[in-house]
Amino acid sequence: MANILTYIKRNWFELLITFCLFSNLYSYTFPSYIYYIGILLIMYKMTRYQVRFVRKNVIYVFFILAIWLSTIINAVYDIRPILYTLILIVAAPFITGVKWHLYKKKLLHNIFIGFACTVVVSLVAKFQGVNYQVTKRLGESMMLYGCVDEFSGYAKFPMWNSAAAAVSMLYFAYLLFREGEKKRWTRIFYIVMFLASMYVCIISASRSAFGLAVVLSVALLKWLSPNFGKLTKYVVIFGVIGVLSFPFFMDSATRMLQKQEAQEETGVTSRDFLWAQRMAEFHSSPVYGVGFAVQGTDENQTVGRGESGSSWLAILAQTGVIGFVIALILWCKTFTRLRNIRYDSENVLIYALFLFFTVHSILEGYMFQGGWYMCVICWLTVAVVTEAKMYRKYLA
């Protein structure tokens, strides 16, 4: 308990930011302005550090210019481009410094704790029988139609809940596999929390988030356990746990399996309609896009919050080929060999999260939805990976 109180005392500001950001996950419970307070707190913290413009990362400036070019040409009068620009300024690696980089790592460390807390909140909601997907969003249970309800707990959307649980899986895989942790009960706690995160991810019914989390957890085992004996030990442990818990997890995965069966029967995925919309928007304005935060074409065009179905298609539709090519270049520049950032084991975890965002952004709007807390975390992750390479000679 004393260690926990000491940690809170030393990290209270970062924990406050984490709370503000994660309030966005529970939009039925907390007012939306709390999330924006979190962004303002990060901006305030940035002013306390010495930062400079990094010329080698000028591509981010071009990305911002592409967004504003599309916004101005299409006469999109909305505050969202301003919000997104501010997020990139505080999070992306084109205005930064060594100490600001270290602070962003500290903030991400607390954000990972936030993901762990979402799993606990989801378990409490499950125990209490709370599922806002049914009671608040849909208004009725899908069991009335012979289906199984997706679980969101106190969160607004099951997908948001599942993505948070998937990141929590990565976090506890990292804590379990890293060198230096020898206490038996601590390792048992990590295993329990990993399995709890897996359970929440499964009942929230996102196949892609769950599959990616499992693959990257195995990758973390490989990256953090170079010793063959240690690697074998964990394979055996999780093999036994997997065999014993298989019936329980399969029973919990009913909704996930139903979605897979429906896709196989119809040949239609849950993203097809959204992807068709994005492509229609792209075809209507292929060079510079339809404008930031714009959905639809012609008389059906709206400005505001909407489900994009894919970060990359949203960028293509809203900023056209110009913005898409720039985004692709800056994202590819982030990839690195693990040895370039391995001087700090936490960089390995953050790189695993970057890979999660890389793949899952094909299906979700992490990169391009400034009103979603995952957008801030996504760009913080990109920045820390990029800066870890850039400042290696100072920190290794």
Residue ranges: model-predicted function:
Residues 73, 124-129, 224-262, 279-284:
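A membrane-periplasm/extracellular boundary helix in multi-pass inner-membrane enzymes
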Residues 46-51, 55-57, 218, 222, ...:
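Hydrophobic transmembrane alpha-helices and their immediate junctions
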Residues 260-319:
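Long extracytoplasmic/lumenal interhelical loops at the membrane interface
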Residues 23-35, 76-84, 157-162, 189-221, ...:
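Helix-loop-helix junctions and helix-breaking kinks within/between transmembrane helices
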Residues 1-73, 101-103, 109, 178-186, ...:
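Transmembrane signal-anchor hairpin modules in multi-pass inner-membrane enzymes, especially those
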Residues 39-42, 350-360, 367-396:
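Transmembrane alpha-helices of multi-pass inner-membrane enzymes
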Residues 41-49, 71-126, 217-224, 331, ...:
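Transmembrane alpha-helical segments and their membrane-water interfaces
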Residues 108-136, 156-223:
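Alpha-helical transmembrane segments of multi-pass inner-membrane proteins
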